[in-house]
Amino acid sequence: FTRKQKLQLFREQFLGVTKYGKACKILNEDAIDFNYDLETFTFTASCSEPIKVENPLLGYIIDFDLQDFYVKFNFKTIKSINAIQSLFLGTVKYTETKIDEKIIKNRNDVYFGSAVDFFKGIIDNSWSEKKFILFEDKFSVNPNDYFKVLKKDDLYEVTVTSTNKVSLSIGGIKKTNFYA
């Protein structure tokens, strides 16, 4: 696979494919290293310095210290649509570049239904107020039966406790499936 193809996959998985993700620009792409393991069909990325991302629609410069990144496939491919598992871990620092009413609206739009909003709902048990609904098959289920929250110092650890396939909906729109 070419570096251009690898960079496209990285951008899709790291920044996302929404209008907000597509508007972002990685300012130090040359510092990112890629690898594709042909035996396990696993794409990995690493960077020896924080990845610097400009997000003009949300008014941030983001420094992301990438600790782990991979995308797994069932066969030799590099297309996001064929990914069966992906993960990225790291720490992040946000620096505001500007703020106005449009940026505040954009930030609110992005936050509602986001992974951060989802995990906050798990931690503070505010599923119904946030309009998150968890389904097993076609039946809504109690999220407390599927997640265990453990507080460690100032951090929270969230564990999926069921091995059943469950679906997540927010505001009546199916967002994702996940498994333990």
Residues of each region from the PLM?
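Surface-exposed, low-complexity/disordered segments
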Residues: 1-180
